[in-house]
Amino acid sequence: MTTSAAATLQTARDIVRREGQGVADVADQLDESFVAAVELVGRVTGKVFVTGSGTSGAVARRMAHLLSVCGTPAVFLPGMDALHGTMGAVVSGDLLITISRGGESDELNDLSRRVQQRGVPVIALTASPTSTLGTLADLTAVVDAGPEVDPGGVIAMGSTLATAAWGDALAAVLMQIRGYGWEQVLFTHPAGAVGRIEQLPDALPSLAADGAERRPEA
């Protein structure tokens, strides 16, 4: 390799800046669909399942984890595993969040249709609202960081960070709506440095929303 250190660092910094801008742009894309998603997830009496394939699957796993940490019980559901029987775990009272940038992943669209047949609503997170997923979902939220945040507009890098940020906002807002406190967070997160925190952080501002389920104290 003969690339200079300066060129290497400049390229790396340009990538990070583009990705950072893509994430920042998500703030302006939050609209009525986000509010509707908060209300829909807040009314769920069962569990929230989150699915995706490839890099979207990695984001889905992270989103499910953070929803659970923040007081909204959620489970990552691998798309192909679901079509080999795991879908049986999804029942009436649950909800499915399907993540697909292009909205044309056959296994995710098949899964989404099948859970709808069981009376389970589907929220789609996609950059393409006119895609198959975008049109079949009960609620579609558009998360579009633009093609420039992904190399060649193909390799999902910045776009996955943008979708992750949308999920972070969902988890944090629901936490504040439910009044889910730090005591509850630490009860379910006893391991690692978080579990050894001696002084609780300041309480988050409370939000009010019609229909949101308040989860029981730990």
Question: Model-predicted segments: where are they?
Answer:
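Flexible interhelical turns and helix-capping residues at alpha-helix boundaries
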Residues: 27-30, 101, 178
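An N-terminal, well-structured beta->alpha segment
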Residues: 1-43
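Internal, active-site/partner-interface "lid" segment
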Residues: 135, 149, 175-215
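Glycine-rich phosphate-binding loops that contact phosphosugars or nucleotide phosphates
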Residues: 42, 46-176
